[in-house]
Amino acid sequence: MARYIGPKCKLSRREGTDLFLKSGARALDSKCNMETAPGQHGQRRGRLSDYGLQLREKQKVRRMYGVLEKQFRNYYKEAARIKGATGENLLQLLERRLDNVVYRMGFGSTRSEARQLVSHKAILVNGKAVNIPSYQVKPGDVVSIREKSKNQLRIKGSLELAAQRATLEWIEVDAAKMSGTFKSVPERTDLSPDINENLIVELYSK
């Protein structure tokens, strides 16, 4: 399956939430009507079956983190093998993706932009270039911007946006040095309450 590169508003309207919130601070354009599903007539959403709710939640989270279907299923399988709650494990694996950590640290204004920075070798992990967006960051890892990439205007703009949001407990960032430390794996209470990971577990458990 190819990665979706179409209008972000369309996907967000499909899921009924802003999937691409810029650095957790700036929402999509006000013209993007979240109350109606995409389409010519913008029909309002009908009542979904249990399966429909489970599928929508899975699609919402998958698109939020920018993960393809096969990769998302593999994350679920890995989460199920780890000791603890499968749903929480799944979210923690997604949060540990390098592109997500770059986004959380404010170096990319969206996860998509953060993924580009990683792919273009603008990101260092413990002083070494890593260009794999799915790379799993570990507690204590230092993630920073490569020296020759520090003058990119989009990175500076992203850090300005990130300054508007609340500080995350599991990440420490030195904006001046364009460097941050992944202090610990976030607890479930640290993550969005708008995600119902139990629906995803129910879907894949069938």
Curated annotation (Swiss-Prot):
InterPro entries: Ribosomal_uS4, Ribosomal_uS4_bac-type, Ribosomal_uS4_CS, Ribosomal_uS4_N, S4_RNA-bd, S4_RNA-bd_sf. SMART domains: Ribosomal_S4, S4. The keyword DNA-binding does not apply. Residues 96-156 form the S4 RNA-binding domain. One of its GO terms (molecular function) is structural constituent of ribosome. GO terms for biological process: ribosomal small subunit biogenesis; translation. Keywords: Ribonucleoprotein, Ribosomal protein, RNA-binding, rRNA-binding. Pfam families: Ribosomal_S4, S4. One of its GO terms (cellular component) is small ribosomal subunit. Part of the 30S ribosomal subunit. Contacts protein S5. The interaction surface between S4 and S5 is involved in control of translational fidelity. PANTHER family: 30S 40S RIBOSOMAL PROTEIN, SMALL RIBOSOMAL SUBUNIT PROTEIN US4M. Belongs to the universal ribosomal protein uS4 family. One of the primary rRNA binding proteins, it binds directly to 16S rRNA where it nucleates assembly of the body of the 30S subunit. With S5 and S12 plays an important role in translational accuracy. This is Small ribosomal subunit protein uS4. The lineage of its organism: Bacteria, Pseudomonadati, Pseudomonadota, Gammaproteobacteria, Oceanospirillales.
